[in-house]
Swiss-Prot record:
Organism this protein belongs to: Syntrophobacter fumaroxidans (strain DSM 10017 / MPOB)
Pfam family of the protein (one): Toprim_4
Family: Belongs to the RecR family.
Identification of the protein by name: Recombination protein RecR
Keywords carried by this UniProt record: DNA damage, DNA recombination, DNA repair, Metal-binding, Zinc, Zinc-finger
One GO-annotated biological process of the protein: DNA recombination
SUPFAM superfamilies: Recombination protein RecR
Function summary: May play a role in DNA repair. It seems to be involved in an RecBC-independent recombinational process of DNA repair. It may act with RecF and RecO.
């Protein structure tokens, strides 16, 4: 509950800021206080940047990653392997894989996962577009990189069922013990996946 000691305009800003992920009322209040201390020029530049973000950023027409053009820079890059499509839940997942530098194919962002309890079904995701894209582009391999949550696993199995009759190799990213990790602190699910996904040494 926002303090009644602030003017209504500030209360409204704090309330709106506290809706952002990772921000509670205290953090939102600190940000609001900081905004008041900023120069008018800096505050207006920030407001302009938010307006630009909302008006110019859209999703790539091919993979549904964020972009300010018709296609994102990854889809437009001729050096990328067009035969591989890595399927991820969100743009944040795409960026995590990109930062690893371990993948040089293209992506497909589902924009979520199957979540029946939240009324999210196949028609709410970019699954139809994925199937059309595989057929249109003649992909050799689809790498399913959904998260190892129950929803991510359900989505992966649903995709596998749809893709099994298509002429495309389907793989799932491996999960295991992180580098520097300690087995005694690793959860049962991760240990099970690591053991099932073991490789010859």
């Amino acid at each position: 509950m926002v303090s009644s000691g602030y003017p209504p305009i500030m209360n409204d800003l704090i309330r709106r800021l506290s809706k952002l992920p990772g921000l509670g009322e205290k953090s939102a209040t600190r940000i609001a206080m900081h905004l008041l201390k900023m120069s008018r020029t800096d505050a207006e530049s920030l407001a302009d940047a938010i307006r630009e973000l909302r008006s110019r950023i859209r999703t790539c027409s091919r993979c549904f990653h964020f972009t300010d053009a018709e296609e994102c820079s990854i889809c437009a890059d001729p050096a990328r392997d067009t035969g591989e499509i890595c399927v991820v839940e969100t743009t944040a997942d795409l960026l995590a894989i990109e930062q690893s530098g371990a993948y040089r194919g293209r992506y497909h962002v589902l924009q979520g996962v199957l979540a029946p309890l939240d009324a999210v079904g196949p028609d709410d995701l970019r699954i139809r577009e994925l199937l059309e894209r595989i057929d249109r582009e003649g992909a050799r391999e689809v790498i399913i990189a959904t998260n190892p949550s129950s929803e991510g696993e359900a989505t992966a199995h649903y995709l596998l069922k749809l893709l099994k009759d298509r002429n495309v190799r389907v793989s799932r990213i491996a999960y295991g013990i992180p580098m520097g990790g300690d087995l005694k602190y690793t959860d049962r699910f991760t240990l099970e996946r690591a053991l099932k996904g073991r490789q010859a040494f």
